[in-house]
């Protein structure tokens, strides 16, 4: 995406696939542009327009006009809703917090249909982005929501920001502070926003058992990740086999794994259901 400032206007262009959003806000005196729609709401602007893929618009105090029309193909980043989008923001007309709650509701319905994880003491989210998914799960299942560990954030960045995996793992681990009364002897179900390599997930489970948890169940709000993304540093990898879902497929299929990746990526196929189990 691109934003150009001139003496009399702004020119904004969204990337050709619409991977990331560009919003135009408007009030009685003019317009503004932002990546996150919540960025201008506290200043009195309201959502006025969202650019489509490859669309370019000219913005003045009187409004905006399209210089290049939007393309039809949209490939917006799903991780905006699942992980790194701000809860107050809307993308393509869908609020981030609402979408995360819906994901949790869907996970709870699936567990109910399968008859699994029905005697859990608490539903929890891997903070922060896992929390709204977990709240949706708790509301749908009727199981109480609790926070068995709290994330200490003042001295630590978001764990996906460091450029190497070792540092990402260290940040994630150091931020976790347990609430022992909510862990010891309890059956816990945690909802995480996604599972990429599985290293942080493993450390979270080990952390909970080390603090006395009786059972730990994990649910992922994001479908299995089979391919890395060149745009996101937390999903890039030296080898596709670093991705947990990809490794699991090879464990199930051996050297024939590559031939069935599409089937495992589709939740409606037998292989897709097998992977999730």
Which stretches of residues belong to each language-model region?
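N-terminal segments that mediate ammonia production and transfer
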Residues: 1-130, 138-180
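Generic enzyme active-site microenvironment
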Residues: 13, 190-191
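PRPP-dependent phosphoribosyltransferase catalytic core
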Residues: 8-10, 14, 21, 26, ...
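Feature representing long, continuous alpha-helical segments
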Residues: 101, 105, 109, 131, ...
